[in-house]
Amino acid sequence: MIKAIIGKIIGTRNDRWIKQYKKKVLAINTLEPTYEKMSDTELQNAFEELKKRVRSVEKDLQEKTLLEVLPESFAITREASKRVLNMCHFDVQLIGGMVLNDGKIAEMKTGEGKTLVATLAVALNAMKGESVYVVTVNDYLAHRDSKEMEPLYHFLGYSVGTITASVRDDDERLEIYSKDIVYGTNNEFGFDYLRDNMKYSLEHKVQKSHAFAIVDEVDSILIDEARTPLIISGPVNRRMENYNKADEVAKSMQVEVDFTIDEKNRAILITEEGIKKAENLFGVDNLYKIENATLSHHLDQALKANYLFFIDKDYIVANNEVVIVDEFTGRLSEGRRFSEGLHQALEAKEGVSIKEESQTLADITFQNYFRMFSKLSGMTGTAQTEATEFLEIYNLEVVSIPTNLAIKRKDLNDLIYKSEKEKFDAVILKIKELHDKGQPVLVGTASIEKSETLHALLKKERIPHTVLNAKQHTKEAEIIKDAGLKGAVTIATNMAGRGVDIKLTDEIKELGGLYIIGTERHESRRIDNQLRGRSGRQGDPGVSQFYLSLEDNLLRIFGSDRIKGVMEKLGLKDGEHIESKLVTRAVENAQKKVENLHFESRKHLLEYDDVANEQRKSVYKFRDELLDVNYDISVKIAENREYALNQIFSKLKAFDNQNLSKEELLGLKNILKEDFNTNIELENLEQADSIENFVAEKLKNDYENKMKALDSEQRSRIERIVYLQILDNAWREHLYTMDNLKTGINLRGYNQKDPLVEYKKESYNLFLELIEDIKVEAIKTFSKIQFENEQDSSDAERYLDNFSEEREHESVTYRHEEALDEDLNAAIKVFSKTPKRNEPCPCGSGKKYKDCCAKSGPKKGLFAK
């Protein structure tokens, strides 16, 4: 109350920002007559002078210089836009551009021209000479926006590229990223970052810097998709029959007898009766013994798949595959899979082909990817409801930009019915009334299942209509564009079609504009506001209203008791509804509860990912050092050798150079032979003044002699590549261990321990082990590298050039996989893990290992003895 009164007196924080920006708008507008008089060449030259001014100062002063040249830059960009695009930036769009340049989120209503607004901040920040990324939610918008704005950028002397999933060639991607301005989707940018950190050459890395990014539909990308990490992964061998068996067991279990469902937290709890039944059906005496951990995990996922996830709501089945439906957009999430075996459980449930589970090779959340940028900003029509999260997680403030024209849309109170049937009957009557009148209507549903229900009812009433859900996603833009035609009836799942304007003719405006009907409140108020926002663009008339029932998930789970009590007191008959601000407020309170749950969930995910992120940054930084041709890796190898030997000597009891028994010396001799491929006579160890110094010098000399066959450049490249391979393999195993740690860490809570604190402690210890393992494994591998003296440089080059990077769509969340050349991969594995005597020899001879390289070592190649 007090806050509201103060706000009215001195204005809100948002009001004060807008007031400051309006002063700068005046400065920009005063420059307009000057630039209008210039020829195209003069205008372009003026812009080039601004670029030179920005690039001439030190990097840490460039941001300050951008603010100084902002009025001129914005004025020139606006004038260029008028000439090239025949579009003029309104004053409110200039404000939006300044908000973006300040690293904030510009909340701009639908139809206010966000695509054009972005050009102001993009053109200004590209002056620094580093690529500016414009991030969109799908390939269609990335391609459309870049092509529409490209003539303007070209006029200003900038190059433009677009990264989409269809760009498969690495050289082409490298070329696109070299452009001044790059448009693309959040997935493509994120995956390219991960792929960059699997490359074996700095020149092949596509993302050279993370200077400035503008995220369109920022709420969708940074909020809705924040819980879905990007993962590059490889297959893990699991027995496929376990999924089917777990599915059979799950389907035989009864709700409230064998398990209970917690809908609020989307969890399933197995009862004692359920555990006994499962043990009997699996044929085990204790489901939770360590050897049965896989079975219990499969059962948990099978229960979730059968009782918490529903076809045509959470996923669809198409082409013998289970395809996820994005809960926020209603779009199909092609290539994305549920993790931890849930997707396989769904495949078993639906009787389609079961694909392998996978091991994480590289991963990152959108939260940590976008927080890498020196400056980040965003645009959306709906951000204020999530302003706290944007500020806490991303340090992004939200500024609501005034509309160019006043909003004329009428947002009516919700209508609430007792049952879903009564609600849909009322919706059909309203649609029929509007259709007969000729007024277009857009109907929003919460799932494919509900859109199909409405489709059947409209078909029965013979009302022509179009359905837009995940099954028709390829026609999305065309369907949404036509939603404003006379008599059009369009059913859309959630807010599929974001980014596409629904334009109205004068005739439609006379009829009252686009009528929005929401058939269910979403868990997030923001999604509801997006649906409303499809109507009333740029001062157009329009109406929005939600039709709800007590059987809707939101009201049933979170908030219907109070509303149900009101309806019972009123004694409403079948088909009657209640409509009041009190009820609408109760619904919004229920939504706030859910929003808070989701916020805490995303925050919780980030707290865990922050732990891994610090480790990821350390590993990737070291990786870049190894890729640098100027990095002296010989120093690192010498350090590793010293460390590995210290580890060995520290384990020898009572070690003080000469107090080792003959047995201990023999043990040391065997270790040096087995781990480092170094032969030292026992008598030499016995006679050495300092065993430690003697062994260290021997290992060093042996290694130097082995590497004489190579020139310095070849040696450096091979050492770096082999070290990178060791690092990558160790990092992948570390990620696998971290995944397992995270999976079971919440159980620590039962022991009165904070799972997050425990996770931080154990992951830190695991990281220390990772560093130690890399050092020891590196020196073991390097000690076994050998070139035959007669081997020429072309042979070495052949091995070096055999590194190929292949991208494949795999079977986990947004998965792509990259593979190294099998020959070198296998060669490294030969000596990092010695084969058993009766296993096939890895050299490819076809003989058993004991009859081949176990005797004499590999006959050829990098690792020949």
Swiss-Prot record:
EC id: 7.4.2.8
Reported cofactor(s): Zn(2+)
InterPro entries with a match to the protein in the record: Helicase_ATP-bd (IPR014001), Helicase_C-like (IPR001650), P-loop_NTPase (IPR027417), SEC_C_motif (IPR004027), SecA (IPR000185), SecA_CS (IPR020937), SecA_DEAD (IPR011115), SecA_motor_DEAD (IPR014018)
Catalysis performed (reactions): ATP + H2O + cellular proteinSide 1 = ADP + phosphate + cellular proteinSide 2
Keyword Glycoprotein: no
Keywords, in A-Z order: ATP-binding, Cell inner membrane, Cell membrane, Cytoplasm, Membrane, Metal-binding, Nucleotide-binding, Protein transport, Translocase, Translocation, Transport, Zinc
Membrane topology: Peripheral membrane protein
GO molecular function terms listed in the Swiss-Prot or TrEMBL record: ATP binding; metal ion binding; protein-exporting ATPase activity
Cofactor binding remark: May bind 1 zinc ion per subunit.
GO BP terms, alphabetized: intracellular protein transmembrane transport; protein import; protein targeting; protein transport by the Sec complex
Residues that bind Zn(2+): 841, 843, 852-853
Gene3D superfamilies (alphabetical): Helical scaffold and wing domains of SecA, P-loop containing nucleotide triphosphate hydrolases, SecA, preprotein cross-linking domain
Pfam families the record matches: P-loop_SecA (PF21090), SEC-C (PF02810), SecA_DEAD (PF07517), SecA_PP_bind (PF01043), SecA_SW (PF07516)
Chain positions recorded as ATP binding sites: 93, 111-115, 501
Localisation: Cell inner membrane; Cytoplasm
GO cellular component, one term: cell envelope Sec protein transport complex
UniProt record similarity statement: Belongs to the SecA family.
Name of this protein: Protein translocase subunit SecA
Naturally occurring in which organism (per UniProt): Helicobacter acinonychis (strain Sheeba)
Gene it is expressed from: secA
